[in-house]
Amino acid sequence: MVATDSSDQVAKFDVSHKIIEDIVYSLSNRIFSYAEHVPLNRYLTQWNNSGRRNGFSNNVELFNLEARSGASAFLLGSYTAAISSPGVYSMMTPSSCLSLLNPLLSNIIPFYGASKPLVVHVAALAYLEQTYCADNVSVLDFSYANNFTVFASQSNVEAAHLALASTLAAKAAPVIHVYEPDAIVTTTDPSLPLLDSNAVVECFNSYQSEADPVSNASKALKHVNDYFNTSYAPAEYYGSQTASKVIVTFGKSETVAARALLAANPDVGVLSIRIFPFVAENIFNVLPTTCKSLVVLSQVRSTAVGTSSIYYSFLLATLLSTKPSALAISEHRYSLVESVTLSSLFDALHETLQLKAATPKAVHVDKSINVWESDVGDSLVLSLVSAYRTDKSRSVAFRPLFDNLTLAGVRFTVAQVSTANAVLTDVVKDVDADITILTTDRLPLHYRVLAKAAEHSICLLQSSIAPDEATKKLPYEFIADALEKGVKLVLIDPKKFAIDASNLPLLVSFIQLVKPGLGVDEALAVLAKQNNLTDTNLKDAVDSLKQSLSFINLDASALKDREPSEKELPSTAKETSFAPNAVKTLDEDITPQSSNWQTVAKQIIFPEAYKKKDALRPDVSEKVFTVHVRANKRLTPAEYNRNIFHIEFDLGDSGLTYDIGEALGVYGVNNKTHVHDFIEEYGLDANELIHVPSIQHPGHWETRTVFQALCQNIDIFGKPTKKFHEQLLEFETDEKERADLQILISPAGAPDFKRRAEVDMLTYADVLKEFKHAKLTAAQIAQIVPVIKRREYSISSSQKKHNDSVHLLVVVVGWKDGMGRDRYGQCSHYLSNLKVGEPLCVAVKTSVMKLPTSPLKPIVMAGLGTGLAPFRAFLQFKEWQRMQGIESGDILLYLGSRTQREEYLYGEDWEAYHSANLLTHIGQAFSRDQPYKIYIQDVMRSTKDMLKKALMDEGGSFYLCGPTWPLPEITSVLEEVIQSSYDEPVDARKIIEQWKEERRFVIEVY
C-alpha cells in the first residue's frame, strides 16, 4: 500500500494510519502495541528501529506484544512501578482485544497520575464470521465499565487532531481514541499532512487539565481547536436547522451513511457524538429547537440484538434527566456483522422517519476504478494511477481489501481520482465504478464483479478466452450485469503480447481510457520508466498490442438457454485479512524444474522483460545479512570429547543490529566434499540449473546450480521421513526394490524403519543411493527432499560493548552411527570449520530473554552448558550501563557443566565480573568433579535465602537457558523459595504462573 519512486515528479503514497502513529510517537515515552495481526504499528516500528526520538527529544520505548488474556499486565506493571518514568503511555490495539486487556487494565485508575497520561488508540475492528467489521460497541462497553473517556474520529483527516486531543485529556484520566479501520488501509496521494511535531508538543505542554474527566475532554478539544484553527465539538450537528427528526450516530460509518440521507430529506438532521460519556448541555446546544424525535443508531453484539445497548441507555438517561418530555427517543439496533451503508440505513428507517430514497453523491470523485486481481505479487493499482501522478491538480485514494479464502487469495481495490483541485483523504463509499479491471477470467466465477459497475462503464478483462467463445464461457451473472448496465467489455489476451507474463496491454488500455486521444506509443511511454522498458521492448509492445485486444459485442441472445448459478455470488470480496494470503493452495502443482544456461542468459541480458531480482537468500522471509568470521576459538581442550567453541562474526557494513537475549539464525551449508561425492556417485551434473518457484517472491522463480542447491538448500544429509519413502516409491522401477520400499513404509516395517533412522542413521543421500532404480533428476530431488532448516544460537554478546561484532557459544554435536561413520550436527560442524574471513548468511531472531525494565531489579540467571550464552550478553550490557552511571540490582548466576577444568565456559568473564562487584554471586555446579553428582538445582537450593531476597523481597526476575531436563527440579527449588516467604501454605505454582505473565520467569530450553 505504500510505494515510493525516486522521480521528483512522482508522488508518494502513504497509509492514512501514519498520521495517527505520528502523533502517538511524537507524544509518547512508552508505547504498548497489542496488534500482532493488524497493521497498527508499521510506522512506529520503522521510526523506533531508526532511532527517532519523540517530540520531547526522548528515546521511545516500543513494546510489540501478544494480544492474549492477561497481556495488559506488562503495561500495568510498567505504569505502577515506583521508578516508572513520567511521560505519556500509549497503547495501540484493535477493539476486539479490549476484552482480553480489560481485567487488568481496569486496575490502573487507583495509580493514575497526570505526569503519566494513558491514552489507548483503538481501531474499531473485530473479526466475525470470517470477515473484518467495524466494532464500536466493544469500545463503548469498555469505556462505561472502566470509566475511560472516549474520543471518536470520524474521518482519516481528523485522526491526527483527535489523537492529540485525547492525549491532552489523558492528563486527567485514562482516555480511548477510537477510529474505524479504513485508516489502516486507505492509501492517499498526496500524503495526508502530518502535524508539525513542535506545534504538537507545544500544544500538549500548554494544556492545563480539569479534574472532571467529562468537562476536561471538552476543554481538551477546544484547546486543539484554538491551536490548529479547527472546529471540533463534543457533539456535532449536520442538516437543516428546522429539522424535526434527528438521527444520532457514533463513529465514521454511521455518520457518513446518515449524512448521505440529508440531501433528499430536509426534515432530517444528523447528530454525531464525538465524546463519550456526554453532557446533555453539549447535545441540546446543537440540536435544532424544532427537533421532536431522535433515532439513536446502536451497534450491539449479535447475541444482544433484542436488548438496548449501554450507549443508548446512557444517552436516554442523560437527555431525559435534563428535559424529561422534550423529545421522543427511539433506538435502531444493528449487529456487529451488519455494515452500515446508505442503502441499509434507508431500508431500516424509511418507514419510521418517512424517508425519501437518496442517491449517493461522489463528492470530489472524478473517476472510480474497481480492480480485481490475485494477491500474488505487486498490485496493479500503483501502475494504473501513474497516469495521474504528474497531474498536481488531482489526488488519488485507494483502499485494498484482501479475501484470503477465495482462489488462494484475492485483492480487491477501489481506487478513486479526485476532481480538479480537490483532495481525497479517503475512499468515498457507495460509488459505482467507471472502470472495472479483472486480471483473470476466474474472478467472475466467484464474485458478481460488475454489480458495482456504473451505467455505460468499461470492463477490461485479461483472459485467453477466444473472443467468439466469451459469451459462452463467462458466467451468466457477469453477462447479465454487463447487459443491464450497458457495460463495454474489452478482452485482453496477454499471450499475444510481446512481453511474457506482462500486464502491460491491460495498463496501456487503461491509460488510453483515462487520457483520451493518447496514442498507443504515448500510453506505453507513460509506463516505460515504471516497467524498465527499452526502446526495443516498446516497439515490440506497440506492434503486438492490437492483436491482444478484442471488443466484445453483447446482446440479449448471450443469455439464451443459460441459467444463473445455483449459488448466489457476492458483489464484493470478504475482508478476511489485511495482507495477502501467505499460504497458497494452488490448483496446479508448480514444482522445481530443470533449466538451462540459455534461459539464464536471457534473464541476465533482458532483466526488465523478466523482472529479474538479485537476492542473497530469496528462499527465506527473514532479512538476511552477510557477516564474516572474525575469530573461531575452541574453549574445551583438544583431547576432550566435546568441542565447545566461541565464534565471533564481523558485522562490517551489513547493517545487522541485535538486542541482548536475541538469537542468531545461521543458514548452514552442507559439507562441500560430501556434496561432490554424492553428485558423482548418483550421476548428477553439478552445473545443471534448477528452476524453483519462489515462495517469498510470488510470481518469480529462483535459479541455482545443482551443486549450489545441494550445498545451501536441500537437506540431502538429513534424516529421511516416511513421506519421502512414499514419494520415492512413485519413481521406483525395480520390482524387488519396490517391494522393499512398500514393506518399509507399512506397519510391518515399522521396527526396521526405526532402526534405520535411529541406529544406522541413514540420510536422504543414503536412501537415494540404496534404491538406485528409483532414479531421480536433480529437480525431482529438490521436489521431495526438504530444505535445510535454519539453526538458531543464543547470542553471547551485547552490541553496546561490541558494536561491530556478534558472538556465539556453540557445541559440535557428534556421534558414530550404526555403520561406524563419524556423524555431526550439520550447522554446528559447519560453524566449527569456518576460517577467519569466511562469509556466511545469518538472520536475527527475537527472543523472550529480556532484562527487567528497571535496572535496579535483581536478576537470577541459571545456565547449563551453552545455555550460558545469553547471560554473558546480559552482563556485558550491565557493564555498559555501569559505564553510563546507571546502577544495577543484585545479579546472581548459577551455572552447570560436567567439569570445571574442561567446561568452565566463559569462566574468566564470570570471575572478572564478580571481582568488579557487578556479578553478586556465582553458583557453580560441576557434576563430575566429585564422587557424587552435584547439579544446578542443588547449588540453588543451598542459597535459598539469597534467592528469596532477590525474587520475593525485591521483585527480581528469573531466567533459565539450556536443556529441558533440569526444569522440573529448578522449578521445585523456586517453589520452596516462594513458600519460605509465607507463614501459611500457598499455591507456589500459581505465583510462578503470575511471574510468567509479568515476564519475571523466563525460560529458553531446548
UniProtKB/Swiss-Prot annotation:
The keyword Flavoprotein applies. Signal peptide: none annotated. It catalyses: hydrogen sulfide + 3 NADP(+) + 3 H2O = sulfite + 3 NADPH + 4 H(+). Gene3D superfamilies: 3.40.50.970, NADPH-cytochrome p450 Reductase, Chain A, domain 3, Nucleotide-binding domain of ferredoxin-NADP reductase (FNR) module, Pyruvate-ferredoxin oxidoreductase, PFOR, domain III, Translation factors. Binds 1 FAD per subunit. Binds 1 FMN per subunit. PROSITE patterns: FAD_FR. One of its GO terms (molecular function) is sulfite reductase (NADPH) activity. GO terms for cellular component: cytosol; sulfite reductase complex (NADPH). Pathway: Sulfur metabolism; hydrogen sulfide biosynthesis; hydrogen sulfide from sulfite (NADPH route): step 1/1. Its cofactor is FAD; FMN. Keywords: Electron transport, FAD, Flavoprotein, FMN, NADP, Oxidoreductase, Transport. Its EC number is 1.8.1.2. It is an enzyme of class 1 (oxidoreductase). Pfam families: FAD_binding_1, NAD_binding_1. Residues 622-852 form the FAD-binding FR-type domain. This enzyme catalyzes the 6-electron reduction of sulfite to sulfide. This is one of several activities required for the biosynthesis of L-cysteine from sulfate. This is Probable sulfite reductase [NADPH] flavoprotein component. It comes from Schizosaccharomyces pombe (strain 972 / ATCC 24843).
